[in-house]
């Protein structure tokens, strides 16, 4: 049960902390759904790097895959270091705020990458994906602090379910916007 603990050594868990933690996933999941999985990835392959397909079919998809792979490889190497520093200096919230700001800025700047600007788009995708994944690692590190014992799975499930809802809501809004834009062309 949220607000209580099975272990007497810990203070009760505040509802607002659990909600804040879960709603971070709600707000954050639109990035993976829209940028990495569906809309921007297709836009990158078709429009930004699409001109390269004439010379080398499949190259736009390869460049997208390289961008995501480089970001994930960097996170693979940096996550243990970032986590150790965040734990040692007790600055998880500051690192989480920084990763969030970098992800938002990197994502917003993607709008400035037009057809043919492959290097800019790749750099921004790499930056935003690194920041996103770093934020995911940092937000997950808060779970043991807001959940105890038998409620950890339930609280984690709240975050996952709100994340899926947030991702689908963001995707729906984006698809609606794209559809309306195409109607008015």
Model region roles, listed by residue range:
Residues 106, 117-135:
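Hydrophobic core of transmembrane alpha-helices in multi-pass small-molecule transporters
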Residues 183-185:
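Conserved small/polar residues in nucleotide/adenosyl-binding loops
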Residues 100-115:
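C-terminal ends and interior cores of transmembrane alpha-helices
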Residues 157-175:
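Glycine-rich segments within core transmembrane alpha-helices of 12-TM secondary carriers
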Residues 9-72:
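Helix-loop boundary and gating motifs at the non-cytosolic
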Residues 86-100:
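Cytoplasmic membrane-interface "Motif A"-like loop-to-helix N-cap segments
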Residues 134-147:
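Intracellular juxtamembrane helix-capping segments at the cytosolic ends
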Residues 58-61, 149-159:
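Loop-to-transmembrane helix entry/capping segments in MFS-fold secondary transporters
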């Amino acid at each position: 049960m949220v607000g209580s603990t099975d272990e007497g050594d810990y203070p009760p868990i505040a509802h607002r902390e659990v909600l804040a933690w879960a709603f971070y996933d709600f707000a954050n999941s639109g990035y993976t759904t829209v940028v990495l999985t569906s809309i921007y990835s297709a836009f990158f392959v078709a429009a930004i790097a699409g001109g390269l397909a004439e010379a080398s079919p499949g190259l736009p998809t390869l460049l997208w895959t390289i961008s995501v792979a480089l970001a994930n490889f960097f996170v693979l190497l940096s996550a243990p270091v970032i986590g150790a520093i965040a734990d040692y200096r007790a600055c998880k919230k500051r690192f989480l705020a920084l990763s969030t700001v970098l992800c938002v800025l990197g994502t917003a700047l993607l709008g400035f990458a037009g057809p043919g600007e492959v290097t800019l788009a790749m750099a921004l995708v790499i930056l935003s994906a690194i920041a996103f994944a770093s934020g995911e690692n940092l937000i997950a590190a808060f779970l043991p602090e807001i959940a105890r014992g038998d409620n950890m799975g339930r609280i984690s499930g709240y975050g996952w379910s709100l994340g899926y809802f947030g991702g689908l809501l963001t995707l729906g809004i984006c698809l609606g916007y794209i559809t309306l834009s195409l109607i008015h062309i």
